[in-house]
Amino acid sequence: MGSSANTETNGNAPPPSSNQKPPATNGVDGSHPPPPPLTPDQAIIESDPSKKRKMGMLPLEVGTRVMCRWRDGKHHPVKVIERRRIHNGGQNDYEYYVHYTEFNRRLDEWTQLDQLDLDSVECAVDEKVEDKVTSLKMTRHQKRKIDETHIEGHEELDAASLREHEEFTKVKNISTIELGKYEIETWYFSPFPPEYNDCVKLFFCEFCLNFMKRKEQLQRHMRKCDLKHPPGDEIYRSGTLSMFEVDGKKNKVYAQNLCYLAKLFLDHKTLYYDVDLFLFYVLCECDDRGCHMVGYFSKEKHSEEAYNLACILTLPSYQRKGYGKFLIAFSYELSKKEGKVGTPERPLSDLGLLSYRGYWTRVLLEILKKHKGNISIKELSDVTAIKAEDILSTLQSLELIQYRKGQHVICADPKVLDRHLKAAGRGGLDVDASKLIWTPYKDQS
């Protein structure tokens, strides 16, 4: 969304032509009339050279780096990603879409000029020259919070694809959504149909996931919508938690809407339009009004690589409740029912690997603590449905594997196991396998 160049005058009048009359004088001495009084804005600029210099910077170019006041009241370094004119504003009246360089792209937002410290302006950087990854400068608390809430999509992208992806999705198109009783601030761009390009906020039916431009449309829809839970089969219920299996082929519109919704909170997720190939497992909190989606994961119906999970999301309004860990555990319970080992789709992001490594660590160490005698990696894989390579890499990262006489040996000192278990943290909500009523997918065609 480039901006066309504007022709600007320098404010100086052209010299009079030969056939023009000289300006009238004001008195016998031939002097010019006194200039008109300065406006307040002009007076400020004239009396404050720094103000004049700052005004000369405007509008800021895309790529400019500057300090920006965030909602915490503090200034943070940002990079201008895009700009747009303010309706009915002056020549230099723009809003600026900025990326906080210390933080994840999900915090990118439109800002007003008064949030920017023009004294800190650095000139625009050529994107072709600058091809660096900004290191995250976070406190331990901030990093832990992002580790616990971050969810990752189907795949990470190579450098060229990542640049193309970030250019196409650099400006968030939908700022907020309403879903059930929550108004949720979105994190990323999602490729909604063109007719929704002018929307800042979307209204979702929390049961069928149809989305609308206006609140009145949602209210009319809710009076007619018969659904009180996701379509598909309820395969698990324990207390107030339910899990529904949704076939992307049988419920195509729901599955596509779920992908649109998920992309608002997943950065490098590939949006699959061919949802026929996937099953979606939608986790809900249930009450007397219905079953309210809190998150989901998807998996391919047929995976040659033994992937048991393609994409996973816990909605922001339900995070930090253990649902992400529950979804990972549930994917392995399905693998056990299938009689197969499973693994998440690769490659994993750093934070995605962190989530899985935490799950694998807790599951494996609990077994090693209780087990008496020798146990092989294959036996651990058979019991847990975790792929042998994932078990080996996890135990190696904990330094619990030694190579002796041509084979890997697990060294499970009880004190060491306890220390690692404590470091791994809580396991989240437990999946009660006895409540799972499910038959593995078989192609009906």
UniProtKB/Swiss-Prot annotation:
Its EC number is 2.3.1.48. It is found in: Nucleus. Expressed in cotyledons, leaves, stems, roots and, at higher levels in developing flowers, particularly in the anthers and gynoecia. Constitutively expressed in all tissues, predominantly in shoot apical meristem. Acetyl-CoA binds at residues 312-314, 319-325, 349. One of its GO terms (biological process) is DNA repair. Residues 1-23 have a biased composition (Polar residues). Keywords: Acetylation, Activator, Acyltransferase, Chromatin regulator, Metal-binding, Nucleus, Transcription, Transcription regulation, Transferase, Zinc, Zinc-finger. It comes from Arabidopsis thaliana. Interacts with MRG1 and MRG2. Autoacetylation at Lys-269 is required for proper function. GO terms for molecular function: histone acetyltransferase activity; zinc ion binding. Residues 60-118 form the Tudor-knot domain. Histone acetyltransferase which may be involved in transcriptional activation. Acetylates 'Lys-5' of histone H4 (H4K5ac). Essential for gametophyte development. Negative regulator of flowering controlling the H4K5ac levels in the FLC chromatin. This is Histone acetyltransferase of the MYST family 2. The modification N6-acetyllysine is found at residue 269. Gene3D superfamilies: 2.30.30.140, 3.40.630.30, N-acetyl transferase-like, Winged helix-like DNA-binding domain superfamily/Winged helix DNA-binding domain. It catalyses: L-lysyl-[protein] + acetyl-CoA = N(6)-acetyl-L-lysyl-[protein] + CoA + H(+). The active site is at residue 345.
